[in-house]
């Protein structure tokens, strides 16, 4: 009911009388007053004037589902959202939901994470209320061999959303990080549950530093606030990310991975650099010369031979 009241206030042009809300929402004016008190306690600034009614003045900087879904206008991504004040990891929660059959497009987000993680078990620093920490459940009818394409697609969608909202152009460090200059802005973690040649579901985790200060991040990281020199509305950023993911996900499902590749190649932080790819099968060092049609990175070794890596931890050497 709180969500309905907020939506009612957002759509109103000016003040809304308690009587009108009572009739439209089919509840007593006393119940409406009670909900208003609860919403104020959550951080909503609601003005009440005798004989005029209620008016929403400001919303809190919180990733509430009803805030994210208001005017989201997606068909799949974000139609169901689980929001938490704090979680160990949104990835773990989303994976459990995936196992339970939760619909594709479901989002798990948290204001903060106590055990946020990146690739290879690394810690993802998640200062509370300063970033977007979320995991998305996808159920694409694709073979497991195409999963690297999902990671790159999410990277492109995230970069496009950031550019649209801030005019910043992030570069993509293959396969899963976004950078501004030499500093990391966002990371992507993809985990899948598959049987033989069939993907049951994928969980895509996103960590984006939005309003974090330098003192709250590692020396190698940055945030949108640091780069733009101003605080940003996390809900608006999150909405743009979800819209962008839906757009690029549908492109991928329709066989247009070439558009993802083109974007990655044009905005790569890795290509033309000397790199080392760490892999259990053995490290590979050389120049990153391309991204293959299946999303793998092409490395030209000093011998002149070219090897493709589909996964691995990559280090930029120069």
Stretches found by the model and what they are:
Residues 80-81, 105-107, 132, 171, ...:
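Structural motif
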Residues 2-163:
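N-terminal lobe of the biotin/lipoate ligase/transferase fold
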Residues 47, 170-171:
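A local structural micro-motif
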């Amino acid at each position: 009911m709180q969500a309905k009241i907020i939506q009612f206030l957002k759509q109103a042009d000016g003040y809304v009388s308690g009587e009108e809300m009572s009739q439209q929402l089919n509840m007593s004016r006393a119940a409406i007053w009670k909900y208003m008190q609860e919403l104020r306690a959550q951080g909503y600034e609601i003005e009440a004037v005798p004989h005029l009614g209620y008016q929403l003045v400001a919303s809190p900087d919180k990733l509430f589902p009803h805030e994210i879904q208001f005017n989201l206008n997606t068909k799949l991504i974000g139609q169901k959202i689980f929001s938490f004040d704090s979680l160990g990891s949104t990835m773990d929660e989303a994976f459990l939901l995936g196992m339970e059959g939760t619909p594709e497009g479901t989002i798990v987000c948290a204001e903060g994470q106590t055990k946020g993680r990146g690739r290879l078990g690394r810690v993802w620093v998640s200062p509370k209320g300063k970033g977007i920490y979320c995991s998305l459940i996808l159920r694409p009818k694709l073979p497991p061999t195409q999963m690297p394409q999902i990671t790159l697609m999410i990277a492109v969608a995230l970069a496009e959303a950031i550019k649209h909202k801030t005019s910043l152009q992030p570069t993509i460090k293959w396969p899963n990080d976004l950078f501004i200059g030499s500093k990391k802005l966002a990371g992507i973690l993809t985990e899948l549950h598959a049987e033989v040649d069939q993907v049951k579901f994928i969980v895509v985790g996103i960590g984006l530093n939005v309003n974090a200060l330098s003192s709250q991040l590692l020396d190698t990281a940055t945030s949108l606030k640091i780069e733009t020199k101003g605080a940003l509305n996390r809900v608006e950023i999150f909405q743009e990310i979800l819209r962008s993911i839906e757009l690029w996900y549908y492109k991928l499902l329709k066989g247009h991975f070439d558009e993802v590749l083109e974007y990655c190649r044009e905005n790569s932080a890795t290509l033309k650099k000397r790199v080392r790819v760490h892999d259990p099968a053995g490290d590979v060092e050389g120049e990153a010369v391309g991204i293959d049609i299946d999303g793998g990175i092409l490395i030209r070794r000093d011998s002149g031979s070219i090897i493709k890596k589909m996964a691995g931890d990559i280090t930029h050497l120069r």
